From Swiss-Prot:
CC per GO annotation: cytoplasm
Function: Together with the chaperonin GroEL, plays an essential role in assisting protein folding. The GroEL-GroES system forms a nano-cage that allows encapsulation of the non-native substrate proteins and provides a physical environment optimized to promote and accelerate protein folding. GroES binds to the apical surface of the GroEL ring, thereby capping the opening of the GroEL channel.
Claim: Chaperone is one of the keywords in the record: yes
Superkingdom of this protein's organism: Bacteria
Protein name in the entry: Co-chaperonin GroES
Gene: groES
UniProt cross-references to InterPro entries, sorted A to Z: Chaperonin_GroES, Chaperonin_GroES_sf, GroES-like_sf
Lineage, highest ranks first: Bacteria, Bacillati, Bacillota, Clostridia, Eubacteriales
Organism name: Syntrophomonas wolfei subsp. wolfei (strain DSM 2245B / Goettingen)
PANTHER family to which the protein is assigned, alphabetical: 10 KDA HEAT SHOCK PROTEIN, CO-CHAPERONIN GROES
Length: 96
């Protein structure tokens, strides 16, 4: 993947959700499931500028596992794969 986010944005590969099955054996369709809120950072922008014109460093790096806001980010598709492009402010926590 060749994509470089700008400013304080990053590209995230959303964690796969395992197929859910009810107690009676029925599979739950993707449209009925909660949106996943975990993923892996694949690309990071250079950071936003503060009021003094200085670039602020990003709090995450490529390879970090994160938890992000439920409705954070914009879905994109590259080479048949789905990703999210989001602002750093949409990140809630890093997973260690």
């Amino acid at each position: 993947m060749k994509i470089q986010p700008l400013g304080d944005r990053l590209v995230v590969k959303v964690a796969e959700v395992a197929a859910e099955k009810t107690k009676s054996g029925l599979y739950v369709p993707d449209t009925a499931k909660e949106k996943p809120q975990e993923g892996e950072v694949l690309a990071v922008g250079p950071g936003a500028f503060n009021d003094k014109g200085e670039r602020m460093p990003m709090d995450v790096a490529v390879g970090d596992k994160i938890i992000f806001s439920k409705y954070g980010g914009t879905e994109i598709k590259i080479d048949g794969e789905e990703y999210l492009v989001m602002s750093q402010r949409d990140i809630l926590a890093k997973i260690n």
